């Protein structure tokens, strides 16, 4: 028997407890600007820490290979119903353990090794699971990539021409570092014209899409994959949305195709997050995410930094650092010393190596969760620029860190 009072983390494992406490303090003290990170609600975390972690549930609601699944069936069906409502989807699978596995599930459902796929080039903003040479998607399939035009928007004309020439079996839209709106309808028409499947990976934009502040790909795509964290503000995991005609193939692809027992405690967290995302408060939050990102970009531009594509129409932006004579790797480290957390990121046609880069990726979801609005976004933009203007001045870094501390104390993550 486990007596709850005797089995607390601090008693059983002081080392892990200490690390958790330090990470909690870091999240409170630092302004999180990594576009793919966010803060989940205590309700989501409570679901993930529940007894559902004990339950094996291979299969799907009503069709399990284990007994005792009547209550986890309720949880999974709630998650399915809510995510379908959230995005207007015909069918959904909430079992993928990650966005990458959601993508893999689609590939296994409709492709064979050697088939041709077409996705956005990783070097110009795509994702490694869309055909990068070192990723399984690049090893198992013949990959052709589309990219950006001179205005650093997706080159839709070139995309269409390439699709007509190469006749891929699957066209993929979606990105990990692209700030503008993606014309899912146009790409969907290209796919239809050549008889290709169309998959959208909306992992970065899902929260914005749920709130109606970014185009919804669901009406135009055969499959839509997403993570459930990032802008959606749920637990770490994945989801596949699909047309009803593909539901059986996708379900078989996930189980028994690439996964065994689903993580029911995480699916519970997904269900809670989807319920939160259906509220008016979540819509208002996403509207503020977009406003904050726009102000952040405008501030950085005013301070002499170049934003790839010249602006953002979403939650994310790429900042070209070459004018400041600093690499993304160095900027990430120095901004971190000032308690501003960003990630190094390649810019289009980046001359630097992938682990060095000429840019950083900056996003607004996490700081907006804290309660930041336009005024704070402007302050953050100026603080970033202050660091980059004098990156090797210890006094400057200390001054910025003090200003960050004043902000984070006013806006705690978990009050």
Curated annotation (Swiss-Prot):
Residues that coordinate or bind (6S)-5,6,7,8-tetrahydrofolate: 122, 126-128
Q: What is its EC number?
A: 2.1.2.1
Going by the UniProt record, its keywords in alphabetical order are:
Amino-acid biosynthesis, Cytoplasm, One-carbon metabolism, Pyridoxal phosphate, Transferase
- Which Pfam family, an example, fits this chain? SHMT
What does it catalyze?
A: (6R)-5,10-methylene-5,6,7,8-tetrahydrofolate + glycine + H2O = (6S)-5,6,7,8-tetrahydrofolate + L-serine
Give the subcellular location: Cytoplasm
Q: In which pathway does it act?
A: One-carbon metabolism; tetrahydrofolate interconversion; Amino-acid biosynthesis; glycine biosynthesis; glycine from L-serine: step 1/1
Q: Which InterPro entries match?
A: PyrdxlP-dep_Trfase, PyrdxlP-dep_Trfase_major, PyrdxlP-dep_Trfase_small, Ser_HO-MeTrfase, Ser_HO-MeTrfase-like, Ser_HO-MeTrfase_PLP_BS, SHMT-like_dom
One example GO MF annotation = pyridoxal phosphate binding
Cofactor(s) the record lists: pyridoxal 5'-phosphate
One annotated Gene Ontology cellular component of this protein: cytosol
Q: Which GO terms describe its biological process?
A: glycine biosynthetic process from serine; tetrahydrofolate interconversion
Q: Which domain of life does the protein's organism represent?
A: Bacteria
Main location per the UniProt record: cytoplasm
Q: Does the keyword Membrane apply?
A: no
| EC primary class | transferase
- Residues with the modification N6-(pyridoxal phosphate)lysine, per the entry, are 230
The protein's site described by Plays an important role in substrate specificity is found at: 229
The keyword Cytoplasm is assigned to this record: yes
The record's comment on protein family reads:
Belongs to the SHMT family.
Query: What biological function has been recorded for the protein in this entry?
Result: Catalyzes the reversible interconversion of serine and glycine with tetrahydrofolate (THF) serving as the one-carbon carrier. This reaction serves as the major source of one-carbon groups required for the biosynthesis of purines, thymidylate, methionine, and other important biomolecules. Also exhibits THF-independent aldolase activity toward beta-hydroxyamino acids, producing glycine and aldehydes, via a retro-aldol mechanism.
Which protein, by its recorded name, is this?
Serine hydroxymethyltransferase 1
Species, as recorded: Cupriavidus pinatubonensis (strain JMP 134 / LMG 1197)
User: What is the organism lineage in this UniProt record?
Assistant: Bacteria, Pseudomonadati, Pseudomonadota, Betaproteobacteria, Burkholderiales
């Amino acid at each position: 028997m486990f007596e709850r009072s005797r089995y607390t983390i601090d008693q059983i494992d002081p080392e892990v407890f200490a690390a958790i406490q330090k990470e909690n303090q870091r999240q409170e003290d630092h302004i999180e600007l990594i576009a793919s990170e966010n803060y989940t609600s205590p309700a989501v975390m409570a679901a993930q820490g529940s007894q559902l972690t004990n339950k094996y549930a291979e299969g799907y609601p009503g069709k399990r290979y284990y007994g005792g699944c009547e209550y986890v069936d309720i949880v999974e069906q709630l998650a399915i119903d809510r995510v379908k409502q959230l995005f207007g989807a015909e069918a959904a699978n909430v079992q993928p353990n990650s966005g990458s596995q959601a993508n893999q599930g689609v590939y296994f459902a409709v492709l064979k090794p050697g088939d041709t796929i077409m996705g956005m080039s990783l070097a110009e903003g795509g994702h490694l699971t869309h055909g990068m040479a070192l990723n399984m998607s690049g090893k198992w399939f013949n990959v052709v990539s589309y990219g950006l035009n001179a205005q650093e928007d997706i080159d839709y004309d070139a995309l269409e021409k390439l699709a007509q020439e190469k006749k891929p079996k699957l066209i993929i839209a979606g990105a990990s570092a692209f700030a503008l709106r993606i014309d899912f309808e146009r790409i969907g028409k290209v796919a239809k014209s050549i008889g290709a499947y169309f998959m959208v990976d909306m992992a970065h934009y899902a929260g914005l899409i749920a709130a109606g502040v970014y185009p919804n790909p669901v009406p135009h795509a055969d499959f839509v994959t997403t993570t459930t964290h990032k802008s959606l503000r749920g637990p770490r995991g994945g989801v596949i949305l699909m047309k009803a005609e593909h539901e059986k193939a996708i379900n078989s692809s996930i189980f028994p195709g690439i996964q065994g027992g689903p993580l029911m405690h995480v699916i519970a967290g997904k269900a809670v997050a989807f319920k939160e995302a259906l509220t008016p408060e979540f819509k208002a939050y996403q509207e503020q995410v977009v406003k904050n990102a726009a102000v952040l970009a405008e501030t950085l531009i005013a301070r002499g930094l170049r934003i790839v594509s010249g602006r953002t129409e979403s939650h994310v932006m790429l900042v070209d650092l070459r004018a400041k004579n600093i690499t993304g790797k160095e900027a990430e480290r120095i901004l971190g010393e000032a308690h501003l957390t960003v990630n190094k990121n390649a810019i289009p046609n980046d001359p630097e190596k992938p682990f060095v880069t000429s840019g950083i990726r900056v996003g607004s979801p996490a700081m907006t969760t804290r309660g930041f609005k336009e005024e704070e976004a402007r302050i953050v933009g100026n603080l970033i620029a202050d660091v980059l203007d004098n990156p090797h001045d210890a006094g400057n870094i200390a001054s910025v860190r003090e200003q960050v501390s004043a902000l984070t104390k006013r806006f705690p993550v978990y009050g």
